[in-house]
Curated annotation (Swiss-Prot):
Catalyzes the reversible oxidation of malate to oxaloacetate. The active site is at residue 176. Its EC number is 1.1.1.37. It comes from Dinoroseobacter shibae (strain DSM 16493 / NCIMB 14021 / DFL 12). GO terms for molecular function: L-lactate dehydrogenase activity; L-malate dehydrogenase (NAD+) activity. Keywords: NAD, Oxidoreductase, Tricarboxylic acid cycle. Belongs to the LDH/MDH superfamily. MDH type 3 family. Substrate binds at residues 83, 89, 121, 152. NAD(+) binds at residues 10-15, 34, 96, 119-121. This is Malate dehydrogenase.
Length: 320
């Protein structure tokens, strides 16, 4: 039985980290694509040469030709311009929309049966555009956002409570931006909801509110520290978790930017919601009940995403 083929579109910081993680986990053979000749080939060769030391069996190929992604089982899209200090994810809209058109056409022509995970920002608008440009089924095109945002939330909570991250669960819904909605009521430590932990004196509401805000600002915090780019280790790890759920039919319940058609009262748009990922792609959107305040925050986030979608339509009139 042939190993799965995983195409990574974009050989920047996230793309290179993805290639390394996929090889280490032996999820499949890697094709690293980029338009900058030499970069994907050099990174693929460097990672491949670590194989004898790290003891993984995986083929890695760098390329500038979309034909090399032919038949890929999974495509992870990181191509585009990263954030720099002072930029919001939304500032990237015009530049990265053109990139999504090119990538969508390349995937449609060469890997139409792939499960496509988009990481390019502004995420919710880019995955929506990518699905239209590629024409792939909506359940096979998804955005990586909630897994990363929830991981950041979990990290901050584990630090605050001085407990293992393995015992912390957290949910972040909504758009991948300043309006994201970390749900404290659905987040737990070993099954104990965060509001109960506040009542038990483990933390204060003020500290919890600060953690929620730090989660919203998580990407910007790293951009500000790095000064020359944006996060790449945690985004890559988050996308690999999604790819693994698909390839191994794990039926993981993960928050992702998924297509909504009636769920949460939304129609014909992508936004961060709880999903089940298995061999069918996004097999289910889990329509959880939101409280009044949670719904108001979620609606605000949805409206921000809709604004980006309208801006995209103004740039490219082929989008509907």
């Amino acid at each position: 039985m042939a190993r799965p083929k995983i195409a990574l579109i974009g050989a920047g910081q996230i793309g290179g980290t993805l290639a390394h993680l996929v090889a280490l986990k032996e999820l499949g053979d890697v094709v690293l694509f980029d338009i900058a000749d030499g970069t994907p080939q050099g990174k693929a060769l460097d990672i491949a040469e670590s194989g004898p030391v790290e003891r993984f069996d995986a083929s890695l190929k760098g390329t500038t030709d979309y034909a090399d992604i032919a038949g890929a089982d999974v495509c992870i899209v990181t191509a585009g311009v990263p954030r720099k200090p002072g930029m919001s994810r939304d500032d990237l809209l015009g530049i990265n929309l053109k990139v999504m058109k090119s990538v969508g056409e390349g995937i449609a022509a060469n890997a139409p049966d792939a499960f496509v995970i988009c990481i390019t920002n502004p995420l919710d608008a880019m995955v929506w555009a990518l699905q239209q440009f590629s024409g792939l089924p909506k359940e096979k095109v998804v955005g990586m956002a909630g897994v990363l945002d929830s991981a950041r939330f979990r990290h901050f909570l584990a630090e605050e409570f001085n407990v293992s991250m393995k015992d912390v669960t957290a949910f972040v819904l909504g758009g991948h931006g300043d309006t994201m909605v970390p749900l404290t009521r659905y987040s737990t430590v070993a099954g104990i909801p965060l509001p109960d932990l506040v009542e038990m004196g483990w933390t204060s509401q003020e500290k919890l509110d600060a953690i929620v805000q730090r989660t919203r600002d998580g990407g910007a915090e790293i951009v500000g520290l790095l000064k020359t780019g944006s996060a790449f280790y945690a985004p890559a790890a988050s996308a690999v978790e999604m790819a693994e759920a698909y390839l191994k039919d794990q039926k993981r319940l993960l928050p992702c930017a998924a297509y909504c058609d009636g769920e949460f009262g939304l129609n014909d748009m992508y936004v961060g919601v709880p999903t089940i990922i298995g061999a069918g792609g996004i097999e289910k959107v889990v329509d959880i009940k939101l409280g009044k305040d949670e719904q108001a925050m979620f609606d605000n986030s949805v409206n921000a995403v809709k604004g980006l979608m309208e801006a995209c339509k103004g740039i490219d009139d082929s989008l509907v």
